[in-house]
From Swiss-Prot:
SMART domains assigned to the protein according to its UniProt record, in alphabetical order: BRCT, HhH1, LIGANc
Residues reported in the UniProt entry to bind Zn(2+): C413, C416, C431, C436
Substrates-to-products reaction catalysed: NAD(+) + (deoxyribonucleotide)n-3'-hydroxyl + 5'-phospho-(deoxyribonucleotide)m = (deoxyribonucleotide)n+m + AMP + beta-nicotinamide D-nucleotide
Xref: CDD domains: BRCT_DNA_ligase_like, LIGANc
Entry GO CC: cytosol
Nucleotide-binding recorded as keyword: no
NCBIfam families linked to this entry: dnlj, PRK07956.1
One Pfam match: HHH_5
Protein name: DNA ligase
Superkingdom of origin organism: Bacteria
């Protein structure tokens, strides 16, 4: 039995959001690109088939995650877009057909493509003023990154001064910082001798190195850099570059290292030959590459095609197939998450896979184990495609040892021994004991997280200590902790205890939306929590809201509405709210915020007007546009009717646009909407 669409969508979103957080915020990625790509494509397919289940916090509705705060945040002068992925030549052909259809005029016969190896490292943006390097930053979310100029100055292949006699006043260079394989091996050997944790792969090592606060460590690790694009001012003495190939040659002239294995290909047949050559040849390269970047060479065509919300239309990444490897299953264990979800894992003999040592693989759920007929002792094939960690692809039954027995999924929670429950229509078994240590542990870590109450010092290690020493039995208990109690914990001194007490006290001042998110209501992400807080300004209003009222809020679907209703029906949750209120937590928008919102809405020209949003807008997500409309006093609905005042239409607007025109409803593009909202 496969997962029901709502359940699978929730799983996919959760997995992708965790991976994006680790990649963009922590710079500590644990998911290979091939894994993320496959998950993302499955999510897109499910949301296309079930558009009513799309939520505002879905990874498909956003560009990226926010940068970390340990370094100074900087806004990129020109956004760093992601690349669309193709996983076979059929998808590459479809991409070519799309951009050809998008060009209204005649396609030049000599347009051609530039093929470059996709380096598995960290994207970097460099800014030069009058030829001098003044800023270097990570990609971040594509709009905002982290300034790491001092660290980038240590990379010998990044020139501090451009090799030009009369440089332009401003030059933006983009490229990839990476760690050569030989250097990576030496670093890990040194870390092993020092008793330090080993880097999982060169990509992780490069990301971690760039975020070192001590640039001397960065210099010692000898990162490398390939430049792959640049942006020049249109005025002054800037050279007129007409193609990607010319840009790469000019980058070389300025003193940058560009990948020598690039190639100018006249057509997709040549692109295919290039890809196949390097699919085999990459194994001999001194660095890791996970695919080929294919770009239209002609800059005029690039300018005409432009960008989608996330990708340039004139470029695509053709990815290598995910790697597979055989290994032996030593054990099957189950983990319990903060929502009580029980996930089986295969513990395996260590095996190298795409530069990573793999010892565990997800088995998803009980049904997947039965489908595979997986048994302890089996030889299996695992791959890096489809989950946060590797998955078991198939069992090599012919290699099965004698006397193996089918695996019996546990009927009771391994953490608290409560009976597991598998809700009808769901593939995941759950522990429903709110006092389960695993659920409590996950709930506390979530509550203290950066996007929730942001309690500095209350990470997983300290949470485990608090639970093991019997100091907390619920989230609310942290507000009763004393400095003396904390100092009784291992490695918790007086200063650390005082800092944690202060951080816990400060969390009482966090806004209502953060508190809602911190409660960990199933399916309620950060964006959903903000929507709920805006539409139900007090917890009392939210608790009294019916399923229909919740579902009627733009951005809150059936699944979220039912989850909120169910959560408030649980006695233990009501007791938790009561304790948190007694502790002084905020369960309402401030009166000032409510008053300002009401005044703004009442005075605006769109107050009381009804909007429908459809298609892909150039810069705003639909949820962002909806929130701007509601903030000005307008209403947003999901369907077009005679009561609709405005239809906001982006690309691929579809049937809603047709119906609006039939009814004579006024159409707005994004710019017109923003003008109306002023």
């Amino acid at each position: 039995m496969s997962d029901a669409p709502p359940t699978r969508l929730a799983q996919l979103r959760s997995q992708l959001q965790k991976a994006a957080y680790a990649y963009y915020v922590l710079d500590a990625p644990f998911m290979e690109d091939a894994v993320y790509d496959q998950l993302y494509r499955e999510l897109v397919a499910l949301e296309t088939a079930h558009p009513q289940l799309i939520t505002p916090d879905s990874p498909t509705q956003r560009i990226g995650d926010q940068p970390a705060t340990q370094f100074t945040s900087v806004k990129h002068n020109i956004p760093l877009y992601s690349l669309e992925n193709a996983f076979d030549f059929g998808e590459l052909t479809q991409w070519e057909q799309r951009w050809q259809r998008a060009l209204a005029g005649e396609i030049p016969s000599d347009s051609g493509y530039v093929c470059e190896l996709k380096i598995d490292g960290s994207a970097i943006a460099l800014t030069y003023e009058n030829g001098i390097l003044v800023r270097g930053a990570t990609r971040g979310d594509g709009v905002t990154g982290e300034e790491i100029t001092q660290n980038l100055r240590t990379i010998r292949t990044i020139p501090l001064r451009l090799n030009l006699d009369n440089p332009p006043p401003l030059v933006e260079v983009r490229g990839e910082a990476f760690l050569p394989l030989e250097t990576f091996e030496k670093i890990n050997q040194e870390r092993e001798k020092a008793g330090e944790n080993l880097f999982a792969n060169p990509r992780n090592a490069a990301a971690g190195t760039l975020r070192q606060l001590d640039s001397r460590i960065v210099a010692a690790r000898k990162l490398d850099f390939f430049a792959y694009t640049l942006h020049l001012p249109e005025s002054h003495n800037s050279p007129q570059l007409n193609s990607q190939w010319e840009a790469l040659e000019f980058l070389k002239k300025m003193g940058f290292r560009v990948n020598p294995n690039r190639e100018l290909c006249p057509n997709l047949t040549a692109v295919k030959n290039y890809f196949e050559k390097w699919d085999e040849g990459r194994k001999k390269l001194p660095y890791l590459t996970d695919g080929v970047v294919v770009k239209l060479n002609d800059f005029s065509l690039q300018a005409e095609l432009g960008f989608t919300q996330k990708f340039p239309r004139w470029a695509i990444a053709l990815k290598y197939a995910a790697e597979e490897a055989p290994t032996t299953v030593k054990d099957i264990i189950v983990n319990v998450g903060r929502t009580g979800a029980v996930t089986p894992m295969a513990v395996m003999e260590p095996v190298q896979l795409a530069g990573t040592t793999v010892q565990r693989a997800t088995l998803h759920n009980e049904d997947r184990i039965k489908e595979l007929d997986l048994r302890i002792g089996d030889t299996v094939v695992i791959r890096k495609a489809g989950e946060i960690i590797p998955e078991v692809l198939r069992v090599l039954v012919d290699l099965r040892p004698e006397a193996t027995i089918p695996y019996e999924f546990p009927s009771h929670c391994p953490e608290c021994n409560s009976a597991l429950v598998r809700p009808p229509g769901e593939a995941v078994a759950r522990c429903v004991n709110s006092s389960c240590p695993a659920i409590l542990r996950g709930s506390l870590v979530h509550w203290a997280g950066r996007d929730a109450l942001d309690i500095q010092g209350l990470g997983e290690k300290n949470v485990i200590l608090l639970i093991e020493h019997g100091l907390v039995q619920s989230i609310a208990d942290i507000y009763d902790l004393t400095s003396e109690q904390l100092q009784s914990l291992p490695r918790m001194g007086q200063k650390s205890a005082a800092n944690l007490i202060q951080a816990i006290a400060h969390s009482k001042n966090q806004d209502y939306a953060r508190v809602l998110y911190g409660l960990g209501i199933r399916f309620v992400g950060k964006v959903n929590a903000e929507i709920l807080a805006q539409n139900f300004p007090t917890l009392e209003q939210l608790q009294k809201a019916s399923f229909a009222q919740l579902q009627g809020v733009y951005g809150i679907g059936e699944e979220i509405a039912q989850s909120v209703v169910d959560w408030f029906r649980v006695d233990a949750n009501q007791q938790l709210i009561e304790k948190l209120q007694q502790a002084g937590l905020t369960f309402a928008q401030t009166q000032t915020a409510q008053t300002q919102t009401a005044q703004t809405q009442a005075n605006h020209q769109i107050s009381g007007k009804t909007f429908v949003i459809t298609g892909t807008l150039p810069t705003l997500k639909r949820t962002e546009a909806a929130e701007k409309i509601k903030a000005a006093g307008g209403k947003v609905t999901s369907s077009v009717s005679k009561n609709t005042d405005y239809l906001v239409a982006g690309d691929n607007a579809g049937s809603k646009l047709d119906k609006a025109r039939q009814l004579g409803i006024q159409e707005l593009n994004e710019n017109q909407l923003l003008e109306l909202l002023v």
